[in-house]
Amino acid sequence: MNTKELIASELSSIIDSLDQEAILKLLETPKNSEMGDIAFPAFSLAKVERKAPQMIAAELAEKMNSQAFEKVVATGPYVNFFLDKSAISAQVLQAVTTEKEHYADQNIGKQENVVIDMSSPNIAKPFSIGHLRSTVIGDSLSHIFQKIGYQTVKVNHLGDWGKQFGMLIVAYKKWGDEEAVKAHPIDELLKLYVRINAEAENDPSLDEEAREWFRKLENGDEEALALWQWFRDESLVEFNRLYNELKVEFDSYNGEAFYNDKMDAVVDILSEKGLLLESEGAQVVNLEKYGIEHPALIKKSDGATLYITRDLAAALYRKNEYQFAKSIYVVGQEQSAHFKQLKAVLQEMGYDWSDDITHVPFGLVTKEGKKLSTRKGNVILLEPTIAEAVSRAKVQIEAKNPELENKDQVAHAVGVGAIKFYDLKTDRTNGYDFDLEAMVSFEGETGPYVQYAYARIQSILRKADFKPETSGNYSLNDTESWEIIKLIQDFPRIINRAADNFEPSIIAKFAISLAQSFNKYYAHTRILDESPERDSRLALSYATAVVLKEALRLLGVEAPEKM
């Protein structure tokens, strides 16, 4: 129980008209620490109690009695709580030194499954920065949900089916060079894809030819299938190399093609339930009662199925396979209408578990304010970007610590971590402009800044040869220490907020605040000097390092011991 929960609990025992949850939402942190650590505004009670808020605040302050508070005073309409810094710091440091990286572990999920649909790049196209967001947000959410007691299933729903394969087959047959593709598969396939899209703008017959080849693919044509399988295999080799660089793993690579033989069953269920309507030769599901104007297009007039049919099949398969408590789709916000339709159709089919499905949208990555597009060849490829980030990180590490032994390994952790952290610190629904120089900077709100704060603490602990004692009597009551203690104590609540909002940026911003608070503490406090507080200061440094490393881990970012 953190201090806000303690205060809410104490207040709820003497306030009849508000429960603990309602009180918790009303608690504030005063801007001026001289007004206390936490404040409760009494305005909301005035109507019920038929008293002035000032009088209510005074009465509540008088009734409060807990060893956790140094004092409780009424200031106008507010009840201001001054916490016992020594007692709380002792409690927090004891918890972290005992639990170490398991500090803030929770069992909210009771080991139920969370399925995370994430990354999902398109086969035969290079892995670009555009795919990064879904990959790193999904990976971070997996760590966050595991931290609070869920098991996670990470699904890479590969874009390995669709008309684009018709386009690619046509392009390869017209202009492809087998040896060139074998030597540099993704580069060559991208050139072919960009070329056919450019030429199709002036030659509509190419579109028709592509549609015909895709129909052949759907009908099991031997040549079409062989080319498709080749494109898929070559792409997966490249993708897996990049996933290894990012240290991201998956539990399933079942992509769009996996559901080819599962869509007829969906159409049959919809038909049996009388949900399919005829519209201009196509089959649709009307969703007007859900406030959705456009019906869900299940089957086109030529008999071809659509994304939603495939996603319905995937949803049914995943529920049956994993019995999920939550199923989340980390997909760009431009797909919001699609996921509203998906949930509504599942509801129409009578599946209550459609409520457990959540679309987790995110904003676009731009370059100099311009939208990126693989089709137009305006793209930032991830592999050379990682190489450049690692190179920039290494230059800075060599300048700061030329004697460092494992420079290449550390530079890789810092370079990759910088790209991930910059993405994850951005509020998910906002986009950001890609700026590698800003990402890899050791100054400002960046991954390297947080990693460097962690490495600095490890250096202090090595110099002191500090090993925390679980029975250690650590406590501090100075202002700089208190700022850090409050943050560490808040870590479990921060994790819960990140999970509730599917928002890793809450963790990233917390990590920045904790690193900044420690750096300020380090600048004002002689941690290693002999003094009665030395062990407690070292315990605080240790606890900060534990929580920083764990916060970075929840973001999928490594924390090097030396930098």
Curated annotation (Swiss-Prot):
It holds the Pfam family DALR_1. Gene3D superfamilies: Arginyl tRNA synthetase N-terminal domain, HUPs, Isoleucyl-tRNA Synthetase, Domain 1. Keywords: Aminoacyl-tRNA synthetase, ATP-binding, Cytoplasm, Ligase, Nucleotide-binding, Protein biosynthesis. A motif ('HIGH' region) lies at residues 121-131. Monomer. HAMAP family: Arg_tRNA_synth. This is Arginine--tRNA ligase. The lineage of its organism: Bacteria, Bacillati, Bacillota, Bacilli, Lactobacillales.
